[in-house]
Curated annotation (Swiss-Prot):
Family listed: Belongs to the arthropod phospholipase D family. Class II subfamily. Class IIa sub-subfamily.
Compartments it resides in: Secreted
Tissue expression: Expressed by the venom gland.
Keyword list, A-Z: Cytolysis, Dermonecrotic toxin, Disulfide bond, Glycoprotein, Hemolysis, Lipid degradation, Lipid metabolism, Lyase, Magnesium, Metal-binding, Secreted, Toxin, Zymogen
Entry-listed glycosylation sites: 262
Any one GO MF annotation of this record: phosphoric diester hydrolase activity
Protein name per Swiss-Prot or TrEMBL: Dermonecrotic toxin LiSicTox-alphaIA2aii
Catalytic activity: an N-(acyl)-sphingosylphosphocholine = an N-(acyl)-sphingosyl-1,3-cyclic phosphate + choline; an N-(acyl)-sphingosylphosphoethanolamine = an N-(acyl)-sphingosyl-1,3-cyclic phosphate + ethanolamine; a 1-acyl-sn-glycero-3-phosphocholine = a 1-acyl-sn-glycero-2,3-cyclic phosphate + choline; a 1-acyl-sn-glycero-3-phosphoethanolamine = a 1-acyl-sn-glycero-2,3-cyclic phosphate + ethanolamine
GO terms under cellular component: extracellular region
Species annotation: Loxosceles intermedia (Brown spider)
Cofactor note text: Binds 1 Mg(2+) ion per subunit.
Assigned EC number: 4.6.1.-
């Protein structure tokens, strides 16, 4: 029957790229995004400071939109709290692109702690009916794996270890898959792993490493649960990524991805993920 067939389709996360102003949350979700990616910059003391990308950024985008990090978290909480006037039921996942390149390696743990404190207070509302979206902490440098432990330790110290159920991980530096696996071993992490691969939309990048990540995901002993590709703005690239078997597509144009998912070749194999889809679960065909 139809419902059973629907269940066999791969759930897809359409990830709105560089959503750094509160007003852009609605803009991207209304275009079809069920998830967003937000840049987080840090000050010299490893405090998350702004949701800001800066120059250069993707072709065709303004690089300079920003909010204070905690203000953005409050706006995000409104958008992901059922019953709130600003609630967007479709928005189920947020990737924080952590710009830790400005920090010394020995500040990574501290950055994780401060990030957790901010999220706990301003997004999770101290564990009292806060935002419901799943969160992916995306780290650009494998050496900054202690950020994960700092984040986890802080939530535990503040009495909310259960919130780690809503948190996943990504290393975004396009490193060799084996090296990424080793970083997770050092961090003591198994599960809740998203693997990104990609490059700015100004440049072309093949799917070789995406396919390696997907092979790891689909192998019996792989450490990856989900694979996403960025930044995908064209229909042809979207089709190639879906054909390869990705779980997520990061884009400046969510409506383009939505259009492709509605094409006859794709609508019986893929569907837009909903809140009921566990983003930490490897999809089995």
């Amino acid at each position: 029957d139809v419902e059973e067939r629907a269940d066999k389709r791969r759930p897809i996360w359409i990830m709105g790229h560089m959503v750094n102003a509160i007003a852009q949350i609605d803009e991207f979700v209304n275009l079809g995004a069920n998830s967003i990616e937000t840049d987080v910059s840090f000050d010299d003391n490893a405090n998350p400071e702004y949701t800001y990308h800066g120059i250069p950024c993707d072709c065709g985008r303004s690089c300079l939109k920003w909010e204070n990090f905690n203000d953005f978290l409050k706006g995000l909480r409104s958008a992901t709290t059922p019953g709130n006037a600003k609630y967007q039921a479709k928005l189920i996942l947020v990737v924080f692109d952590l710009k830790t390149g400005s920090l010394y390696d020995n500040q990574a743990n501290e950055a994780g702690k401060k990030l957790a404190k901010n999220l706990l207070k301003h997004y999770w509302n101290n564990g009292n009916n806060g935002g419901r979206a799943y969160i992916v902490l995306s780290i650009p440098d494998l050496n900054h794996y202690p950020l994960i432990k700092g984040f986890k330790d802080q939530l535990t110290q503040d009495g909310h270890p259960e919130l780690m159920d809503k948190v996943g991980h990504d290393f975004s530096g396009n490193d060799a898959i084996g090296d990424v696996g080793n970083a997770y071993k050092k961090a003591g992490i198994s599960g809740h792993v998203w693997q990104s691969d990609g490059i700015t939309n100004c440049l072309l990048r093949g799917l070789d490493r995406v396919k390696q990540a997907i092979a790891n995901r689909d192998s019996a002993n792989g450490f990856i649960n989900k694979v996403y590709y960025w930044t995908v703005d064209k229909r042809a690239t979207t089709r190639d990524a879906l054909d390869a078997g990705v779980d997520g597509v990061m884009t400046n144009y969510p409506d383009v991805i939505t259009d492709v998912l509605n094409e006859s070749a794709y609508k019986n194999k893929f569907r837009v993920a909903s809140y009921e889809d566990n983003p930490w679960e490897t999809f089995k065909k």
